[in-house]
Amino acid sequence: MALSLDGLPEKPAPAEAPSPPVGRRVQASLVFARGGRTTVLSRQVVPYPFHITRAFRMHPESPDLATLYLQSASGGLYAADHLTLAIAARAGARAHVTTQAGTVVHRGGPEPSRQETRLTIAADAFLALNPDPLILFPGAHLAVSTEITAEPGARAIVTESVACHDPVGEGRPFDRLDLGLTIRDPEGRALVRERSRIDGRAFTAPDSPMGPHRAYGTMVVLGAPDDARLAGLHLRQAADAAGCLTGVSPLPNGAGLGLRLLAPDGGTLSAGMDAVFRIVFETLSGCAPGRRRK
């Protein structure tokens, strides 16, 4: 007897796996070199959403020091973005890379938005990288990684800062923040390796390990003539006077000096970071930093 399947419900098709989030995968590259008794941008690869200005000469007493503004043409970091910035300072080059405004990190998903920075600094080169804060919007999921390779005699100032902000004023937290720092010698040996992670609810909770502070910044100083003397140049007092809570300590393996700042908000943090940056910049470069145009 034949068996009929007419009238039986069809077997449901297997559910399709959700597509992984797709963000932008972009790498920008800048190379500063010594040429004609000054510092020139000898190579640049700057795809969207990165954008740079021309190199400015903002230090009459040090005309060889180039200042360059890095900008975002897309309005910030979005879900699952993976943006990488590589900067090299060749021997004798002196460069200051900064921004004109903070970078917004928008709501993310399971896969974080990633920002990687890779710095290579040759002997007798000076590189200062001090962007404005990353601003974490509600639901932002961000992973930041900074890797520095420095030759003996290299000088560098590298800052990083984050603040949180809810545009509608409801105090909604970001999702999660991962921070990583690695400093290597030219042979690839890791001198410093730091990792930290905090979720937004813990960051903003009444019992937060940050206390009442809602903004956090770090500064790495490499190649100072005397770290102990630099630490004594009232760095803590300068940042504290701006409203920050500041710590200064030597980095492992004699790599340099590290600073950490806490502040109630991004504006206060920026003021404290700028106060410290001015002191360190003048110590390492021999001139006061030019006033940044905003």
Curated annotation (Swiss-Prot):
MF terms (GO), sorted A to Z: nickel cation binding
Principal subcellular localisation of the protein: cytoplasm
Entry annotated with the keyword Cytoplasm: yes
Keywords for the protein's UniProt record, in alphabetical order: Chaperone, Cytoplasm, Nickel insertion
Record's subcellular location: Cytoplasm
Annotated Gene Ontology cellular component terms: cytoplasm
Chain intervals with Pro residues compositional bias: 11-21
Chain positions covered by the region annotation Disordered: 1-22
Self-association and partners: UreD, UreF and UreG form a complex that acts as a GTP-hydrolysis-dependent molecular chaperone, activating the urease apoprotein by helping to assemble the nickel containing metallocenter of UreC. The UreE protein probably delivers the nickel.
Function, in words: Required for maturation of urease via the functional incorporation of the urease nickel metallocenter.
Family: Belongs to the UreD family.
PANTHER family: UREASE ACCESSORY PROTEIN D (PTHR33643:SF1)
Name of the protein: Urease accessory protein UreD 1
Annotated organism of origin: Methylorubrum extorquens (strain PA1) (Methylobacterium extorquens)
